[in-house]
Amino acid sequence: MLTNPSQVIIRNQDSLSQHKVLVLNHEADLLPKALLDVAASVDALALDYHHYLHLAPHANSKLRCYFGHDLPHQDPLEREKYDTVIVYFPKAKPLAPYLFNLAANHLVPNGQLLVVGENKGGIKSLVKLLPEYFATGMKLDNARHCLLFGSSLEGSAPAMKLSDWVSQYQLSTPQGEISICNLVGVFSEKRLDLGTELLLSHLPTLSGRVLDFGCGAGVIAAALLKAQPSLSLECVDINAMALASCELTLAANGMTAKVYPSDGLAQTTGKFNGIISNPPFHDGLASTTSIAQNFVTDSAKQLQHNGIWQIVANRHLPYSDIIAAEFGQLKVVADNNKYKLYYFQHK
């Protein structure tokens, strides 16, 4: 089943006949594979690890699948070139200019740019957002509550440098000052959000192997290692920009941890002495509640004997019931008007 934006691309796939195509920020469907009906070859870069895992089993000699903030390359001046680049307009609008710059660095001169997105997702501002090295965006289609715009590469784009897309700032935490590196598209208030502040203000003493689930830009990871530098810390997230941010944050603070993508806890192995998280479950949507349920269930199985599990969750959402059903006896260590901090020790 194709998502609505993907269906709009299929409606307009004739312009891709025998093209070498790159798809950026694709969704959890098989659109890149479907394009092989007309395209000569397709490469696909997912910024969401779940989306990558959905497509990757279908890779072949004409369909290459990648996950990350960039395509793999040896020399930034020798990037692979494509006749057409398709960009799925990102939910995090600040990420859009990054994707356009990446697209331009991979297009042949006068190559075709297609940008698709849902009407409610910010794509209506596409014409204003396109950099000057692209021709003025033209609306090509309006269907399935989505818009499709087309453009072409007219000028020379700046080379892709990750450092151009990072904001670095100092953050005061209960553990002391840390330096945070935040890539575009990654959540940041440039101060401690209430949930993370509650967690860090009641940080337990941990030992051994510890997991930071949904690590984001690495705020919890850096604070944790500042207070307890001997920990063997693993940081997981589903978002490529978050993982890259976390790696930059750790490096900026002279810290080391294992940082890697995981769809929930599926890519983690073994058991942990500690699991800490300010998980991204705060919107109350049914799909998000399901992810929360899976995280709680799976993390309970991966906690060592005497292991510590501590997460902060929105007090107005039904996660306390989910947590209590899995762990039974647990403590609410602290709370404020928005969050509760849950603690469990595996006896």
Swiss-Prot record:
One GO MF term attached to the UniProt entry: nucleic acid binding
Domain of life (superkingdom): Bacteria
Keywords, ordered alphabetically: Cytoplasm, Methyltransferase, rRNA processing, S-adenosyl-L-methionine, Transferase
InterPro entries, alphabetized: DNA_methylase_N6_adenine_CS (IPR002052), Mtase_sm_N (IPR013675), rRNA_ssu_MeTfrase_C (IPR023543), RsmC/RlmG (IPR046977), SAM-dependent_MTases_sf (IPR029063), Small_mtfrase_dom (IPR007848)
This enzyme's EC code(s): 2.1.1.172
Gene3D superfamilies per record: Vaccinia Virus protein VP39
Broadest EC class assigned to this enzyme: transferase
UniProt subcellular location: Cytoplasm
Keyword Manganese: no
GO cellular component labels: cytoplasm
Enzymatic reactions: guanosine(1207) in 16S rRNA + S-adenosyl-L-methionine = N(2)-methylguanosine(1207) in 16S rRNA + S-adenosyl-L-homocysteine + H(+)
Record-linked Pfam families: MTS (PF05175), MTS_N (PF08468)
Known role: Specifically methylates the guanine in position 1207 of 16S rRNA in the 30S particle.
Alphabetical list of HAMAP family matching this protein: 16SrRNA_methyltr_C
The protein's assembly and partners: Monomer.
Family, as annotated: Belongs to the methyltransferase superfamily. RsmC family.
Protein name: Ribosomal RNA small subunit methyltransferase C
Organism listed in the record: Shewanella baltica (strain OS195)
